[in-house]
C-alpha cells in the first residue's frame, strides 16, 4: 500500500507538470481544439501509435482498455514519457525553425484480480502553442504599413481510470472513464503605422471541463502454440460539452487612447466527436509482432464557435462545417530475438511504424493539413540486482504536416519513456 501511495504522489506531480506545458509550436494549433495528441505511450510511439490489437503483460496500452487484462499478476507498472522536437516551417520559399520539449504522459497499471487489470494516468488530448507575426502595406505606395500578430496557448488533458476484464478465455473487454479539462487563449492583433486607423485586437478564450468514455474489445485467435492473431476494436462516446466560448473585440484609437470593446459569448459551444477504431496484431512466438490499425474521429458533426464580420455586421456563432472526419491508418511492429536471452542485444525490442492521417480541420473552406509520419525505436531492458523487467523506450519520429494552400511542417521528434515494472505483489518464501 505504501508503494501504491508513492505512485499516486508521482502521478499528481506529473499531472501538475503537464498542466504547465504545451506540446507544440504549430500555427495550425490556432484552429479548433489545437493540434490533436497521439495519446500513446513509449512502446506505442516507436510503432507510430500502433496498439489497438496489442496485449502486453509489461506495458500500459491505454489505446485499448481491453488490454489491461493481460497485465502480469506480480507487477505494478509505472510509465512516464517526455519528448523533444525540432520543426521546420516553410511557406512560399520562407523557412523557419522552432524547438519544443514537453511532458507527454504518465500512466500506471496492475492486476486487480485474476483476469482483471486496472490502469490510471494522465494523457494529453490536444495542444495549443504558437506566436508569430506578418507585416506588409495596405496600399500600393507603401505609405501605410501593418503588423498582424498571432498568439495562442493552452490545450486539453485527461485523467483516466480504466479496467480490463477477460470473462472468457481469449476474449477481453474494457472501459476507460476520463475527466478532461483545459483551456485556450488566442489573440489576433492588427496594428497600423497610420495613426488615423484604429488598431484592432481579437481575443478568443474558453475554459473546458467534461468527461470521456471509451470502450475496448480484444479477441485472440491462436493458430498453434507459436502463432496467433489478436483482433481489437474501440469505441468512444461523443457528446455535447456545456461550456461557453468568449470573443472580445477591442478597437483602440492610437491618437486619443480611447478604447471600445465588444464581447460575444456562445453557450454550450463545444462537442466531443464519436471515435471508432479497429486493429489486428499477428504474434509469432512472442518474438515478432506486426499489426495494422484504423481509427475514425467523427469531427464532421462537431460545430465550433467562429467570429465573422460581414459588411460591418459582426457575429460570433457556431460553424457547422468547421471540422472534417479524421481517418488514420497505421502499420508497424516489433521484433525481440530473445526476451530471456543472456545476450543483451537479443533482449532489446526493435520497433518500427508508419501512419497516414487525413485533416480534421476545414480552414476557410479548404482542407487543413494531412499528416504522414514514420518512426523507429528500441525497448531497452534495464538490469539491476533485483529487477530486470523495467524498460527504457527510445524512439525517433519524422512527421510531415502539409496542405496545398498553407504552411508545410517537417518535425523530427525524439521520444523517451521509462517503464518501471516492479514485483510488488510477489509472495516471498522464507526458509
Model-derived regions, located:
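Single-residue recognition of alpha-helix boundary sites
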Residues: 13-14, 75, 180, 297
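Bacterial Sec-dependent N-terminal signal peptides
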Residues: 1-25, 431
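Residue-level detector of alpha-helical transmembrane segments in integral membrane proteins
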Residues: 10, 58, 266-267
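Outer-membrane beta-barrel porins/channels
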Residues: 21-46, 111-431
